[in-house]
Amino acid sequence: MTRTIEPSFRESVDLMFNRAAALMDLPPGLEEKIRVCNATYTVRFGVRLRGQIQTFTGYRSVHSEHMEPVKGGIRFAMAVNQDEVEALAALMTYKCALVEAPFGGSKGGLCIDPNLYEEHEMEQITRRFAYELAKRDLINPSQNVPAPDMGTGEREMAWIADQYARMNTTDINSRACVTGKPLNAGGIAGRVEATGRGIQYALREFFRHPEDVAKAGLAGKLDGKRVVVQGLGNVGYHAAKFLSEEDGSRIVGIIERDGALYNTEGIDVEAVRQWIVKHGGVSGYPDATHSAEGSEVLEADCDILIPAALEGVINLSNADRIKAPLIIEAANGPVTAGADEILRKKGTVIIPDMYANAGGVTVSYFEWVKNLSHIRFGRMQRRQEEARHELIVSELERLDRYLGDAWSIRPDFKLKYLKGADELELVRSGLDDTMRIAYQSMREVWHARADVDDLRTAAYIVAIDRVSKSYRAKGL
């Protein structure tokens, strides 16, 4: 029997790109220019730790500079390699184009297991990596702007921003060199939750269109839908929390490194999160059935499957056993090209990663703009909005007194209406708007073209078209 070989992550991205590009009329040579990575840098540096020098290997890939700066996260993991960062950089290009964030695509990574080092050691390593990238202009507010990814967070972004500022003491925009920073270091409200919140907004927009929902063999709204989440990290946790608490979805399965939980009646996401923090995993959690094999829950009966961890978790070996009629890719590349083909033939609807997890880069865009403008969102207009609303409320109260029992103001109306939007509300509003418009641009292609039978191909067509127009505007 001939064994089918799974393509690499980079090859999977290229296969999906090629499928969409074949349906487009691009100028000769431009398809190749868009597809290939412009450059990938490998840096090796030493750090003296525990009495000896340890050498680390890091990468920063720049996929496309049709718009600058380029944008993309930095991940810390032992599995980081050139193929991975190039695939992720390519996805960043298409993702930014799809949601109309004015960036090219980039990605970086460091081969390291953060669990093996103390905090002060991680700071040394991160600062040195930042130094190696910054001196090559691979960290710069106007050229290359990193963000958090797997294994990194606000802490690492604060170290990187400070290291860049130390190296560029006269750059007034130094805080804009990286996004995903803590609020007290130039960050923005809502960045930590952004990708998970984007998943929620993406699903809400999908369920606003009954004909799209019907394609997945579903009906109705998010309320009551059975959801399985693979990976309860930052993205999976926030997506599951918001869907269960705000939309009435039922989280029936949670998959983690040490196994999985399943309960058809629903799982308390917050309780599981606290259990993981305390015990290091889901094993022993009392209010759900524990399975040592996460694959059992990945393949369980549910309405919505959210792969929110690593790439390639749904592949040729398990695609035909996936029962969920709707998959939303919270992680980057969780479905391989081969698995994607199997699932499409089964009729599974996949909301693709380049759209679904774009909440992170969207709010990073807002943070970058905030850093360049040197003022938080809402500072100039919030009180003025409240004053205008006060005039309306005063007039309504006068009418209330005049009309008596014939008409009255709801008790909580004044409190809600008088409160001007703060930064978090503005960020969420901007993210919601972005996710709605991006979905509608994909949906238009999906429904208008007979040769496009899935959202991923539609998303690639929209993104490639926008990138190609940027290159042609440059005279290429």
Regions found by a protein language model. Give the residues of each.
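Adenosine-phosphate binding glycine-rich loop
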Residues: 3-8, 206-207, 321, 325-476
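Rossmann-like adenosine-cofactor binding region
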Residues: 259-350
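Conserved active-site and cofactor/substrate-binding residues in soluble primary-metabolism enzymes
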Residues: 8, 12-15, 38, 80-83, ...
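Glycine-rich phosphate/diphosphate-binding loop of Rossmann-like nucleotide-binding domains
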Residues: 189-299
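Flexible, glycine/charged-enriched surface loops at secondary-structure junctions
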Residues: 27-33, 100, 138-147, 171-174, ...
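General beta-strand structural signal in soluble alpha/beta enzymes
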Residues: 87, 171-172, 253-256, 306-307, ...
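Structural motif
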Residues: 59, 109, 143-144, 175, ...
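N-terminal ligand-binding/catalytic initiation module
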Residues: 1-194, 200-202, 206-207, 356, ...
